[in-house]
Amino acid sequence: MNKPHRVLLALVLLAPKLAQADSQWVLEQSTLTYHVSHPLHQIDGVSHAARGKGVCHAGQCDFLIAVPVKSFDSGDSNRDLHMLQVTRGAQFPLVSVRTRLPETASASATIHADLEIEFAGQTAQYKQVAFQVVMQGNQIRISGIIPATLSDFKIDPPSLLAIPTKNEMPVRVEMTWRPQ
């Protein structure tokens, strides 16, 4: 085999290795809590079912997090069923969140992330959402609040006794990530 063929063979064999990510992260544990307010009561729906992965390459990390809509539990099965109907959960069963962060972000006590959230068949952008970052050994714990609203996703506010809920639907995020 002559030298050009050896170089070509080496490039073909090494190219997949060179294209791989520098590092990867996996979501180990999560608690996502949405809050809806009505003049007669307050509602919190909690999910621990989020899955996520982060892939870092060339100093940037791309994260994707997904959670089934039906995994949120408010403590009232009738309310949860109505939430699935209002959010079109049968047609759009997942909430997904995408963000890109610099690989050095984990060294900060606070990060500001631009989020793209798909929910109920709609996509909303949230700029510079603050999250607190705590390193625990090789794990990174993040927490913060996404300032979501029902109107961001074209969801009509549910009503009780002809009184609609407030438009605000903040989502509290608590996640633990570890290197893969």
List each language-model region with its residue ranges.
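Bacterial N-terminal signal peptides that target proteins for export
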Residues: M1-L8
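N-terminal signal peptide c-region/cleavage motif recognized by signal peptidases
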Residues: A15-L18
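Low-complexity, acidic/polar, glycine-enriched regions of mature
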Residues: A21-Q180
